[in-house]
């Protein structure tokens, strides 16, 4: 686990708890997403690395974000600037989204297939994963022709490799041992 993730977690948890209390989960995702993008800007990154006073940095950051931040979002920016932590806003966003998915019982599932899946196949895979994981599943589908045939499914800690390439690899390992 990276240091940035460890630093970001308390800020994400505080923002998330506040958002739950105020019933503003999606509004906070939008604010954190916007702030995350601002920190990725080349000029802003240089400013964050510079020797700007925290209060001045917070003012600049908030003025750039404008109406994208409500007063509570601005408070978060002030606190993070005081602690020299504005650079971790992308990690705060990532941690916040993980907390939101856990709260809403949603999990992202990556489906890699050898060919493009039909809508019916996607629906079937999604339904079976939801039943198995007892969560709502958001599918992210991609194609990798190197699989030859079949699919690889990754959802949280669950990995199901039902591809021909995976089967051939396991067969090769078995024969070599």
UniProtKB/Swiss-Prot annotation:
Annotated SUPFAM superfamilies: N-terminal domain of the delta subunit of the F1F0-ATP synthase
Q: What Gene3D superfamilies does the record point to? A: N-terminal domain of the delta subunit of the F1F0-ATP synthase
Q: Where in the cell is it found?
A: Cell inner membrane
Sample GO molecular function, one term? proton-transporting ATP synthase activity, rotational mechanism
Q: Which PROSITE patterns match?
A: ATPASE_DELTA
Recorded topology in the membrane: Peripheral membrane protein
What would be one Gene Ontology cellular-component term for the protein? proton-transporting ATP synthase complex
Q: Does the keyword Cell inner membrane apply?
A: yes
Q: What is its main location?
A: membrane
What are the entry keywords? ATP synthesis, Cell inner membrane, Cell membrane, CF(1), Hydrogen ion transport, Ion transport, Membrane, Transport
The record's family statement is: Belongs to the ATPase delta chain family.
What PANTHER family does UniProt report for this protein, alphabetically?
ATP SYNTHASE DELTA CHAIN (PTHR11910)
Q: How does it assemble?
A: F-type ATPases have 2 components, F(1) - the catalytic core - and F(0) - the membrane proton channel. F(1) has five subunits: alpha(3), beta(3), gamma(1), delta(1), epsilon(1). F(0) has three main subunits: a(1), b(2) and c(10-14). The alpha and beta chains form an alternating ring which encloses part of the gamma chain. F(1) is attached to F(0) by a central stalk formed by the gamma and epsilon chains, while a peripheral stalk is formed by the delta and b chains.
State the function annotated in the UniProt record: F(1)F(0) ATP synthase produces ATP from ADP in the presence of a proton or sodium gradient. F-type ATPases consist of two structural domains, F(1) containing the extramembraneous catalytic core and F(0) containing the membrane proton channel, linked together by a central stalk and a peripheral stalk. During catalysis, ATP synthesis in the catalytic domain of F(1) is coupled via a rotary mechanism of the central stalk subunits to proton translocation.
> Which protein are we looking at?
ATP synthase subunit delta
Q: Which organism is it from?
A: Aliivibrio salmonicida (strain LFI1238) (Vibrio salmonicida (strain LFI1238))
